[in-house]
């Protein structure tokens, strides 16, 4: 393999319709060379359609798609200089790992010996050197996933596309393989567009996350930006769960805001807060509970569940039920206990109305 040639991706006012249904209305986005960008969102948000348009498996109704600055809008998939890792890996069960990786090269016109050499190099890149003789059934799920990545990378694409590549793995293996994907992308420096509905997965692997909703971009930013500074209640809840309650921003200056919630004032990071009515997003682990209700923000324990290293509570308040995660497992609160709710310094975000 020669050096990786990471390419950029640009969507310019792309619309995709299926009959009378508009899946993507006027979508514009960019992916910088050498970065891993995740398209994240619930089912039906348009992320898979976006990936298929980029791959050339679908064509836009209007707008332009560019890869590495080249207009590929009307090019077929085999002329786009992208490779895809499918959800199912799509490995041939009767072929060895080496033969699977070499298959795309041979189909692209490489001679068998050269294809084999490149395939061996590709397997080494993903940590499977010396395992080319094994059939897919003789590999773990994570190893099969790496074979699929190697098969895509040996074609030296400008952009690697990953369509929910970890969805068939169990939870423990997903954590390990997502770390391997991120390490490989950073080490080799290829451009990757990654589709998932799993928020933890997106936070772990991405340089940039694009959260999609109803065919559009709800918010784009770094994992930390989206988690700590959500632009809407939808983003706050989608990126790791949040309790959203009404508040009033009294003042915001020098990076700090003074807010009023349930008659009490609190100081939180201001970010882009503006004085006036707003919403406060509260992460489940951003509060402490005290077993006595006084003035201010208080509630009653409506439900609890012991989960080993923490307890999950539902607290009934005047603003509805709050979902709380409490690490103090030795001090579980009985049902119907009246509690006061106190905010920690982190895990709070103001959402402007």
Curated annotation (Swiss-Prot):
SUPFAM superfamilies: MOP-like (SSF50331), P-loop containing nucleoside triphosphate hydrolases (SSF52540). Keywords: ATP-binding, Cell inner membrane, Cell membrane, Ion transport, Iron, Iron transport, Membrane, Nucleotide-binding, Translocase, Transport. It catalyses: Fe(3+)(out) + ATP + H2O = Fe(3+)(in) + ADP + phosphate + H(+). InterPro entries: AAA+_ATPase, ABC_SmlMolc_Importer, ABC_transporter-like_ATP-bd, ABC_transporter-like_CS, Mo/tungstate-bd_C_term_dom, P-loop_NTPase, Transp-assoc_OB_typ2. GO terms for molecular function: ABC-type ferric iron transporter activity; ATP binding; ATP hydrolysis activity. SMART domains: AAA (SM00382). Part of the ABC transporter complex FbpABC involved in Fe(3+) ions import. Responsible for energy coupling to the transport system. This is Fe(3+) ions import ATP-binding protein FbpC. It comes from Brucella abortus (strain 2308).
């Amino acid at each position: 393999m020669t050096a990786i040639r990471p390419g950029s991706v640009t969507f310019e006012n792309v619309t995709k319709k299926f009959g009378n249904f508009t899946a993507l209305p006027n979508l514009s986005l960019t992916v910088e060379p050498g970065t891993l960008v995740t398209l994240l969102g619930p089912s039906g948000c348009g992320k898979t359609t976006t990936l298929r348009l980029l791959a050339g498996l679908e064509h836009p109704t209007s707008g332009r798609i560019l890869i590495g600055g080249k207009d590929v809008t009307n090019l077929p998939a085999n002329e786009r200089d992208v490779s895809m890792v499918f959800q199912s890996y799509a490995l041939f069960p009767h072929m060895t790992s080496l033969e699977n990786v070499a298959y795309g090269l041979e189909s692209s016109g490489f001679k068998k010996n050269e294809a084999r050499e490149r395939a061996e190099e590709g397997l080494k890149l993903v940590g499977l050197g010396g395992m080319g003789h094994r059939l897919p059934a003789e590999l773990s799920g994570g190893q099969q996933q790496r074979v699929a990545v190697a098969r895509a990378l040996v074609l030296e694409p400008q952009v690697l596309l990953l369509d929910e590549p970890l969805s068939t793995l169990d939870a423990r293996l997903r954590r390990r393989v997502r770390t391997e994907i991120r390490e490989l992308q950073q080490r080799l420096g290829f451009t990757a567009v990654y589709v998932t509905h799993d928020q933890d997965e997106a936070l772990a692997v991405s340089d940039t996350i694009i959260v999609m909703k109803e065919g559009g971009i709800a918010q784009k930013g770094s994992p930390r930006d989206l988690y700590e500074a959500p632009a809407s209640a939808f983003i706050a809840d989608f990126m790791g769960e949040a309790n959203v309650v009404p508040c009033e921003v009294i003042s915001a200056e020098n990076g700090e805001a003074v807010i009023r919630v349930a008659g009490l004032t609190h100081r939180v990071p201001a970010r882009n807060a503006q004085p006036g009515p707003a919403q406060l997003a509260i992460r489940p682990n951003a509060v402490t509970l005290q077993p006595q209700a006084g003035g201010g923000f208080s509630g009653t324990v409506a439900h609890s569940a012991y989960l080993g290293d923490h307890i999950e509570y539902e607290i009934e308040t005047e603003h509805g039920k709050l979902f709380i995660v409490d690490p103090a497992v030795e001090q579980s609160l009985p049902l119907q206990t009246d509690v006061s709710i106190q905010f920690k310094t982190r895990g709070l975000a103001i959402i402007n109305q």
